[in-house]
Amino acid sequence: AHALLDHFGTLDAVFEASCEDMMRVPGVGENVATLLTLIPQVGRRYQMAKRRQQTILRSSEDAGNYLVPLYLYERTEVVYLLCLDAKCGLISCKEVGRGVVNAAEVSVRAIVETALSQKAVSVILSHNHVDAYALPSREDELTTRRIRDALLLVGITLADHIIVCGEDYVSFADSGLL
């Protein structure tokens, strides 16, 4: 543990390192490196399960505070769909897309099917920007409109689209982009 901290400098840097980078540190084998790369993923799942219980998302601030921890240590763009009931209670939080450092593929069909299967009244879409700002790109805006329109056809409201970058987030609803 000390060798890893000495090499990478911080615990954050250790958890963000790849298996290959960790195995370059003397005394760190494949098993240890693999275990350490799983810790952030396990932590995210634990936080999701813990926070899902009785979570109400009535505002962009509620949603942003829920979402920021889910993106900790992510090195690629990830898209989540938060399915809500009629009282803005969280039914589920599903990963619906994963990509590379600066882009994630999003299937409008998968989003609609997920929302329908969860019996959502409304949904919040979210994705992260890895090494940039939490500002929407033109492509983010166009994709959001396509998803909003598809959801409306089946009677589901897109309540918000939140972009997370580090500890910051931007709400499409608050920005007038929905």
Task: List where the protein language model places each region.
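Long, charged amphipathic helices and adjacent flexible linkers at domain junctions
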Residues: 43-64
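Conserved hydrophobic/aromatic pocket- or pore-lining residues that grip, position, or stack substrates
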Residues: 88, 125, 160
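Histidine/lysine/aspartate-rich catalytic loop segments that bind and position anionic ligands
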Residues: 64-118, 122
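Divalent-metal-activated hydrolytic enzyme cores
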Residues: 145-178
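A short amphipathic alpha-helix within small helical-bundle interaction modules
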Residues: 11-25
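Histidine-centered catalytic micro-motifs
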Residues: 122-133, 163
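Charged helix-capping and loop-helix junction motifs
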Residues: 107-109, 138-146
